[in-house]
């Protein structure tokens, strides 16, 4: 929307005077920014108008995917993800930082080793990926506490508010993390271009001022004071206009919001709920933030899945390639200019970092699987759209119109949204009016072009939109000076090379397509059959029609070669930027994009670069692959693939061809059931000889938790004593009168938690857990007690993670873990004195390498036996497949060697056999000291656990530790425990170094 010069001058004058001006244009109320300091940019590298960002003065669409470094703590594999994102045609990654992992101890910021952000930033630069930094302090993210460290449960103030106690608690973290981010801003040569100071600050309740401008301004000032000068962006959880530019104190520079239109019902993956496709986002944008580019900072790229859910394979089916085609192109109809998909790669909730509603996997059904595989069709579909956006700058300057069921298509079954360009090309987004329709619809189009308004197809036949599909038809599309009057086939990419231009078009199987080109040249089929191709020459253009074929055809029109592909064939094409100075592709500037070549190469092409007379490709292969390169510079004479000189041929069209042979290596994995397993009882607390004198006493008569008042004589909330993660153990001492008959206890551990209770060594019972239960009140019968005798009640609870804190004012993150209430029949509550423990040291946690959340409070964990080389030489020989014959908790340790071949990316999985026995049990598996699996036999769903290289030593010794908690008097055992792998990938990824894996060392003060 363009304002008149007079209007613009008046607005600028008002801004200079510090006034806010509101006016109405075409029915929309516009609020212009009232804060001149906001408009005076702090840097010159990242600017914007109402259409898009500019980076270094060049207009750019930000196409981004979400990726959290803390969910993949191996730095070389972080580069792998960045390169796979770059290969999509994307230019950006958004990331969270999990405060709970770097300030587990109040006042001690530890961001080294696997928590160091700088290697992540360096990898982004190497891959040529910009970054959107989202450090919180609140992140949500299906993480424990929403990223809040557990000690915030003791803060005497409302979280995410302007209460001083909360703001003071955030200062240390934000000052450190924002300073690191500032160091890597684009202004300092780094990859970070945007900063988000809060997260989904959208909902408030309970008498708290919301939205609170004082609070938002504070968190923005925290970033600015730490040196952040790049633009600030927000992500309103819905398009509500919170903190948009012009709203006063606390306003951000660029307004953004989130959208998850299909929801999270992975149990019904074929159901697209009626009316859930957004249609009003453009209207809302013009009302809320018309002077900034339209931004969706989180758009649905997958779904979470709860304990007992259908599994992430179902989520990837729900949010599949069809969803992408319909929903993402719908976003394009709103002229989205900053688009981030949540998630592009989910990763793993290792080491207790997840929230209570989710399990170990955070695969999210995203385009890149948890094991970093890219064989989901949705990855390939994204690549088509990402590369189209990369070469279609006219999209950003077009003017979006209203969707309509008339005027463009000849059927009301279809809806068309135009984006009309002024000499920069126009774009028409076509979908079914019922977005969930699975019908195939035949149609013709009437589109305005520079030549005339034309009905398409002109050469006969009809177009087809298949069910759950959408297309972007283009008119007056500029291919380096050649005008494509229209194309019904979709554009994958185009390039101008020294010897001519190349345009790559694709369509769905069985479709008919047509394009018209402004030219006086004839059409020549230079590759493939002429069958199914027709053309017609006019005085100023040529029209070409064709039926989509699985066999590639290439036509020549003047100096333009056009590749006609079917969609599945297009999936095999890549468009790497060609580096001429070094090996890094660089960021996606117009110059770098123009330098790209086109490669047909199957699984993955990472990079391309020139060195001397050599063209070097780095690529991955999962099958014998024919490689073709289009647009090879004339200076290149030799082809190198993954460093090896590769013989090639050159055809009449200048296409280089070579073959990469794939010979799968022999992969030999150890039989885990046959390892030399050692066993130690990890619940010695129920033995009569156990001494808990070193345990912390649960003797606080008041809690610092402001959410829930005490219902016990002393606090039994674990966070009051510094325990925020993993298993909790309580020991309650009392002297019997002989009249006690029952013991009732209300425990709380979060969704799907479990608990078990013993009286001395006598098992009383368990709560085995349900997804729907975050707490449970149980009553257990007691045996006849002897008057005057001392007894100990031992309670085991697993903390499934802390609640998130989405709605400001509810303070749900403070929901306590532990014992909420108890009743020993016939006795006052004060008759029992309690002790408790969690991880050794609590907030002063022992293992600074693996972080504050990785280990819980089981005896073996407190001792550090889960780390490599525990002192197991005198332990009993027993396997988790033998298990326990009664209720209790066992600990098992064993080692094995791997010798996997170099140069191969081999995804490995720990598989726990799905239980066929009725006895419920819970399992943790530690790999070289890192907890990488949590399994609940009676809830599920996860039974297969990816463990990345770097956590596993692929060429060396590895240590497994298993905790087995039997919650039934019959005991429990693993049905099976196996290592498996999926298709090895011949990879260009470099050597993967193992993360630091400290060995067992006797812990001072361990009890």
From Swiss-Prot:
The keyword Secreted applies. Keywords: Carbohydrate metabolism, Disulfide bond, Glycoprotein, Glycosidase, Hydrolase, Polysaccharide degradation, Secreted, Signal. Substrate binds at residues 96, 140-142, 199, 260, 364. The keyword Electron transport does not apply. InterPro entries: Betagal_dom2, Betagal_dom2_sf, BetaGal_dom3, BetaGal_dom3_sf, BetaGal_jelly_roll_dom, Galactose-bd-like_sf, Gly_Hdrlase_35_cat, Glyco_hydro_35_CS. Coiled coil: none annotated. One of its GO terms (molecular function) is beta-galactosidase activity. Residues 862-881 are annotated as: Disordered. GO terms for cellular component: extracellular region. It catalyses: Hydrolysis of terminal non-reducing beta-D-galactose residues in beta-D-galactosides. Disulfide bonds join 205-206, 266-315. One of its GO terms (biological process) is polysaccharide catabolic process. Residues 1-18 form the signal peptide. Glycans are attached at residues 156, 373, 402, 422, 478, 522, 622, 739, 760, 777, 805, 914. It is an enzyme of class 3 (hydrolase). The active site is at 200 (proton donor), 298 (nucleophile). Its EC number is 3.2.1.23. Its main location: secreted. Belongs to the glycosyl hydrolase 35 family. Cleaves beta-linked terminal galactosyl residues from gangliosides, glycoproteins, and glycosaminoglycans. This is Probable beta-galactosidase A. It comes from Aspergillus phoenicis. The lineage of its organism: Eukaryota, Fungi, Dikarya, Ascomycota, Pezizomycotina. The gene is lacA.
């Amino acid at each position: 929307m363009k304002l008149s010069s007079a209007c613009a001058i008046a607005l600028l004058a008002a801004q200079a005077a510090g006034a806010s001006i509101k006016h109405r244009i075409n029915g929309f109320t516009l609020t212009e920014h009232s804060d001149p300091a906001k408009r005076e940019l702090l840097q010159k590298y990242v600017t914007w108008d109402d259409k898009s960002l500019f980076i270094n003065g060049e207009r750019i669409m930000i196409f981004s995917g979400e990726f959290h470094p803390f969910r993949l703590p191996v730095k070389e594999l972080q580069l792998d993800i960045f390169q796979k994102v770059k290969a999509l045609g994307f230019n950006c990654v958004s990331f969270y930082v999990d405060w709970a992992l770097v300030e587990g101890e109040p006042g001690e910021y530890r961001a080294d080793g696997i928590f160091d952000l700088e290697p992540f930033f360096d990898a982004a630069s190497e891959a040529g990926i910009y970054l959107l930094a989202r450090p919180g302090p609140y992140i949500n993210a299906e993480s424990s506490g929403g990223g809040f460290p557990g000690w915030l449960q003791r803060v005497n103030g409302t979280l995410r508010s302007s209460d001083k106690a909360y703001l003071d608690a955030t200062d240390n973290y934000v000052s450190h993390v924002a300073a690191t981010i500032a160091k890597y801003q684009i202004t300092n040569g780094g990859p970070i271009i945007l900063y988000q100071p809060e997260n989904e600050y959208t909902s408030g309740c309970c008498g708290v001022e919301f939205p609170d401008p004082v609070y938002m301004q504070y968190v923005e000032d925290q970033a600015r004071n730490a040196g952040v000068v790049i633009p600030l962006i927000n992500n309103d959880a819905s398009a509500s206009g919170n903190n948009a530019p012009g709203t006063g104190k606390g306003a951000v520079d660029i307004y953004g919001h989130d959208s998850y239109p299909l929801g999270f019902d992975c149990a019904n993956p074929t159901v697209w709920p009626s009316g859930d496709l957004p249609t009003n986002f453009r209207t809302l944008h013009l009302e809320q933030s018309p002077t900034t580019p339209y931004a969706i900072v989180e758009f649905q790229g997958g779904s979470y899945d709860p304990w007992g859910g259908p599994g992430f394979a179902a989520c990837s089916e729900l949010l599949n390639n069809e969803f992408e085609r319909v929903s993402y192109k719908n976003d394009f109809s709103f002229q989205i200019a900053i688009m981030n998909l949540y998630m592009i790669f989910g990763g793993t909730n290792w080491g207790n970092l997840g929230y209570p509603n989710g399990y170990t996997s955070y695969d999210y059904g995203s385009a890149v699987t948890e094991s970093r595989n890219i064989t989901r069709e949705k990855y390939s579909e994204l690549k088509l759209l990402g590369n189209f956006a990369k070469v279609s700058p006219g999209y950003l300057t077009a003017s979006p119109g209203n969707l309509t069921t008339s005027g463009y298509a000849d059927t009301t079954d279809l809806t068309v949204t135009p984006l009309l360009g002024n000499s920069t090309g126009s774009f028409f987004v076509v979908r079914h009016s019922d977005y969930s329709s699975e019908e195939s619809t035949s149609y013709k189009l009437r589109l305005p072009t520079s030549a005339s308004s034309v009905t398409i197809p002109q050469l006969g036949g009809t177009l087809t939109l298949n069910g759950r599909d959408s297309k972007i038809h283009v008119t007056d599309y500029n291919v380096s000076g050649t005008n494509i009057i229209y194309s019904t086939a979709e554009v994958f990419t185009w390039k101008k090379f020294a010897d001519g231009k190349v345009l790559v078009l694709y369509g769905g199987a069985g479709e008919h397509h047509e394009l018209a080109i402004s030219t006086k040249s004839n059409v020549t089929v230079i590759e493939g059959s002429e069958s199914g191709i027709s053309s017609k020459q006019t005085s100023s253009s040529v029209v070409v029609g064709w039926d989509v074929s699985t066999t590639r055809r290439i036509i020549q029109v003047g100096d333009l070669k056009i590749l006609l592909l079917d969609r599945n064939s297009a999936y095999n094409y890549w468009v790497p930027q060609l580096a001429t100075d070094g090996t890094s592709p660089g960021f996606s500037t117009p110059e770098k994009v123009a330098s790209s070549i086109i490669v047909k190469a199957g699984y993955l092409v990472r990079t391309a670069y020139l060195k001397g007379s050599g063209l070097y490709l780095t690529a991955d292969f999962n099958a014998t692959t024919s490689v073709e390169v289009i647009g090879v510079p004339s200076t290149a004479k030799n082809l190198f693939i993954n460093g090896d000189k590769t013989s090639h041929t050159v055809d009449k069209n200048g296409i280089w061809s070579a073959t990469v042979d794939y010979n799968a290596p022999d992969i030999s994995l150890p039989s885990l059931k046959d390892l030399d397993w050692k066993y130690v009882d990890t619940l010695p607390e129920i033995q009569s000889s156990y001494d808990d004198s070193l345990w912390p006493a649960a003797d606080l008569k008041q809690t610092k938790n402001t959410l829930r008042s005490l219902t016990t004589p002393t606090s039994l909330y674990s966070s009051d004593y510094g325990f925020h993660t993993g298993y909790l153990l309580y020991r309650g001492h009392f002297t019997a009168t002989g009249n006690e008959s029952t013991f009732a206890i209300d425990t709380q551990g979060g969704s799907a938690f479990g608990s078990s209770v013993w009286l001395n060594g006598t098992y009383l019972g368990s709560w085995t857990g349900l997804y729907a239960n975050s707490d449970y009140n149980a009553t257990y019968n007691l045996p006849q007690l002897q008057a005057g005798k001392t007894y100990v009640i031992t309670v085991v609870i697993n903390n499934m993670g802390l609640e998130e804190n989405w709605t400001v004012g509810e303070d749900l993150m403070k929901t306590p873990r532990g014992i909420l209430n108890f009743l020993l029949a016939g006795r006052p509550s004060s008759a029992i004195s309690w002790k408790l423990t969690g991880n050794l040291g609590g907030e002063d946690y022992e293992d600074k390498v693996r972080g504050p959340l990785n280990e819980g409070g089981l005896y073996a964990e407190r001792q550090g036996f889960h780390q490599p080389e525990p002192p197991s030489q005198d332990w009993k020989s027993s396997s988790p497949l033998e298990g326990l014959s009664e209720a209790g908790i066992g600990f098992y340790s064993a080692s094995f060697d791997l010798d996997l071949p170099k140069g191969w990316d081999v995804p490995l999985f720990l598989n726990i056999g799905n239980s066929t026995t009725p006895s419920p049990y819970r399992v943790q598996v530690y790999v070289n000291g890192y907890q990488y699996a949590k399994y609940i036999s009676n809830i599920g769903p996860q039974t297969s656990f990816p463990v990345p290289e770097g956590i596993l030593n692929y060429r060396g010794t590895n240590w497994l530790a298993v905790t087995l908690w039997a919650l039934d008097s019959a005991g429990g055992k693993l049905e099976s425990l196996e290592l498996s792998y999926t298709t090895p990938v011949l990879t260009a990824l470099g050597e993967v170094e193992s993360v630091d894996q400290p060995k067992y060392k006797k812990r001072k003060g361990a009890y």
